[in-house]
Amino acid sequence: MHKELFPFFTHYPELVYLDSAATALKPKSVIDAEVEYLTLASTNLSRGLYPLAEQTSAHVDIIRKLTASFINALPEEIIFTSGTTARLNMLALILEESLSADDAIVVTDFEHHANYLPWKELAKKKKAKFKILKSTDTGTISEAELTATLTDNTAIVAISALSNVTGVMQDVPRLIESIREIVPHAVIVVDAAQYIAHKAIDVRRWNADFVAFSGHKLYGPTGIGVLYGKHNFLRVLKPRIYGGGMVLDACGPETTYKESPDRFEAGTQNISGIFALGAAIDFIKSIGYDALQRHDQKLQKYAGERLIDTFGEQVTLVGGKDYTRRSGILSFTFTGIHPHDIATLLGEKGICVRAGEHCAQPWHRGHGLSATTRLSFGLYNSKEDIDLFITALIEIKELLSPKS
């Protein structure tokens, strides 16, 4: 669709890249933005009074406003970070003080470990209960499961907006509305790392308390991410990472912290990453989420139908065949062939896919699976890529089939 915009393919023109859920490739505009900082700015934030440093700080302020507008937030609700994992861990540390042994933390069974382990460890540390919402066979959370699992002592609910295994999208506004009807006081945290690469986010409509996502899933660079937090939380919560740039007074008996976001951004940020994140957001806006969604659904439907038509009952699509509820990700199992063998042999043919548990062991173990093979699509993919994948998979099946 837009392969010419990605310099990666200048170096690897024959490669079929079907692993965008691990990290998306970077368009030239994003690469140029990072190089621009490194070559033309290369100064720190809020440290220097000379013009170049002030220009850098002003540009980061512009990108913070751009990021806020992108998800319908306020600039002071946007905290830059090294990625989704880092900020979810930081958030768990921040919320630790408010948690007691009488409380419960609830997560879904399809969470990435980044939105599972921090809450599991926090519950263990505070001797709180740790509960898991079990999803249906189609990857959603039922009202009955919410009612059975959420109780008055539920303090935190953590959910992924889009599973990195099944590709199934949650109806986030409806899900959060249902959670709030049962436990209106609970803090709701959403991992949107996969979702934001495929569909627009409106944090006001979602009504989550915190939302985290990474730049590198969004055609941006690695090492940069965002934590959105409602302003009424951020203005009262205490930081748990300390250093330069986040205090008004460090000398008194009690430290006086700056307002958000400064109080949560101690030390030097990944400034080149922030420049590039701004370019990635502009890139997505230039394409448009509607076009992106149509592209995603066309490819995943085509891939799913070709797998079933070609291999029949040997292939099981994880999360079902309702392509309208999933976006950008299609995982499957193949009877008699291990996903690692499939991925390794595909790799030797220049086709890049992911195999394993995808940092989502609870989901795999809960479904009796040791691994799955995952295809994940980007703007640079086409039906021709899927045809090449199917042809290669036919050859792998023939290679590994028992000989009579």
Where are these regions (language model features)?
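Pyridoxal 5′-phosphate
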Residues: 1-404
